[in-house]
């Protein structure tokens, strides 16, 4: 089996995690107590869903997941929520005092007390796997726990499981909406380690997803639950081929191979289509061509940046439901003829396609319509550099005055780490710029890169 372990760090990661496991359980027909009426074989079994769930002798299905937070309130909601019986109590790890939006507390002072316990629990899950494929790490980098403890954990995972892939689903601060004053500091310090210790990072941004909820689902005031359910659909589509059987299945490592041209350039943009409310879906056809086009709409991107300002390096389309390769090829051919969607000249093919026959499931009482076919696109575009340059600019404004820096230094960080992380991001922006430059005829070969 090719198992995957999910790690949810901090409030953002845990709440996205709740939405994901709720959806996975619905997709596989697993009840909130872990029983699965449709699964007749007790014990192991070679079913595809065993990549995400392990099965006990009593026939109970337990998610291969760990939830970590430095303070108890959010995890207590999981402990008392609908799915409290789904998780093993040891999978829910919470500390006593939180990171207070401070990267240094999450990474140095408070995080380091809890990180060994986390790694122990992860080791137990890993020992329970026959062929561990990699980790999915969910966190947000605006706060203290997600950024600090999240990056500490990734660093330690690199040491313990060097060869395993790590995919990050990371919530980045939004351009307009802010939840903490020190977001730019936390996210830049955290990205500094994401650069080195994740293989693929999918960037999500609340503001972009708010706008999608308002525009496509007509929700006037979207809540985090609305956002998280949308993110869960994306993650479900990405992992569908690990959990169900399909025509063109995609492994975690395949993402990496197809999406990452250079190790540092691994920050992905995602979109999902059709995001449509039940009232509208009734009147629309939503052919493969239509959903493919809307996946490329700048307005449907889950991070605030405009792909028209950049070039695509690679792009992975995960279709699910009633989709045949012929339609996919036709609609991708149409996309390639469009002038608005530009690929870099050194990557002529650029498309990776996965097809899974299991249609997407929706949460009962949720906002999304049940549709016959859906697509999730993960693309590597130079436009994502906009997200970094925005953050860098905010970081510079604060750091020029050394505002709030004493909180970090007081927790044992050195000021040099700020400038080191900032320089690393400046280099990253430069990398993105260089990747998008046209290669002149004949000189591209000699330059060796």
Curated annotation (Swiss-Prot):
Pfam families: Tubulin, Tubulin_C. Its EC number is 3.6.5.-. Mg(2+) binds at residue 71. One of its GO terms (cellular component) is cytoplasm. SMART domains: Tubulin, Tubulin_C. GO terms for molecular function: GTP binding; hydrolase activity; metal ion binding; structural constituent of cytoskeleton. Keywords: Acetylation, Cytoplasm, Cytoskeleton, GTP-binding, Hydrolase, Magnesium, Metal-binding, Microtubule, Nucleotide-binding. Dimer of alpha and beta chains. A typical microtubule is a hollow water-filled tube with an outer diameter of 25 nm and an inner diameter of 15 nM. Alpha-beta heterodimers associate head-to-tail to form protofilaments running lengthwise along the microtubule wall with the beta-tubulin subunit facing the microtubule plus end conferring a structural polarity. Microtubules usually have 13 protofilaments but different protofilament numbers can be found in some organisms and specialized cells. This is Tubulin alpha chain.
């Amino acid at each position: 089996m090719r198992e995957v372990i999910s790690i949810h760090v901090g409030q953002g990661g845990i709440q996205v995690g709740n939405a994901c496991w709720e959806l996975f359980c619905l997709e596989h027909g697993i009840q909130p107590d872990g029983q699965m009426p449709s699964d007749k074989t007790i014990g192991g079994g070679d079913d595809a869903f065993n990549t995400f769930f392990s099965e006990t002798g009593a026939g109970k299905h337990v998610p291969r997941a760990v939830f970590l937070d430095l303070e108890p309130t959010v995890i207590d909601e999981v402990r008392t929520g609908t799915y409290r019986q789904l998780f093993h109590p040891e999978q829910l790890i919470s500390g006593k005092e939180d990171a207070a939006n401070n990267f240094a507390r999450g990474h140095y002072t408070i995080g380091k007390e809890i990180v060994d316990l986390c790694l122990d629990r992860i080791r137990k899950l890993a020992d329970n796997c026959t062929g561990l494929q990699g980790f999915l790490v969910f966190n947000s980098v605006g706060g203290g726990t997600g950024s600090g403890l999240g990056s500490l954990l990734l660093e330690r995972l690199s040491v313990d499981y060097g060869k395993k892939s790590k995919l990050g689903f990371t919530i980045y601060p939004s351009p307009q909406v802010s939840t903490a004053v020190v977001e730019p500091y936390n996210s830049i310090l955290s990205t500094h380690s994401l650069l080195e210790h994740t293989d693929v990072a999918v960037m999500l941004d609340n503001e972009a997803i708010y706008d999608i909820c308002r525009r496509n689902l007509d929700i006037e005031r979207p809540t985090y639950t609305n956002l998280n359910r949308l993110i869960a659909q994306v993650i479900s589509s990405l992992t569908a081929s690990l959990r169900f059987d399909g025509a063109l299945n995609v492994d975690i490592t395949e993402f990496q191979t197809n999406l990452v041209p250079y190790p540092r350039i691994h920050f992905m943009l995602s979109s999902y289509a059709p995001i449509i409310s039940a009232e509208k879906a009734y009147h629309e056809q939503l052919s493969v061509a239509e959903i493919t086009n809307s996946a490329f709409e700048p307005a449907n991107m889950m991070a605030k940046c405009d792909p028209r300002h950049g070039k695509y390096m690679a792009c992975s389309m995960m279709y699910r439901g009633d989709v045949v390769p012929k339609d996919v090829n036709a609609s991708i051919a149409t996309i390639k003829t469009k002038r608005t969607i530009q690929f870099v000249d050194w990557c002529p093919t650029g498309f990776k396609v996965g097809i899974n026959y299991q249609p997407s499931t929706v949460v009962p009482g949720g906002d999304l319509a049940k549709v016959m076919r859906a697509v999730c696109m993960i693309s590597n575009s130079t436009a994502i550099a906009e997200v970094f340059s925005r953050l860098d600019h905010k970081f510079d404004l604060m750091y020029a005055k050394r505002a709030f820096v004493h909180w970090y230094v007081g927790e044992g960080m050195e000021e040099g780490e700020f400038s080191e992380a900032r320089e690393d991001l400046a280099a990253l922006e430069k990398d993105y710029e260089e990747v998008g430059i046209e290669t002149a005829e004949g000189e591209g070969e000699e330059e060796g890169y």
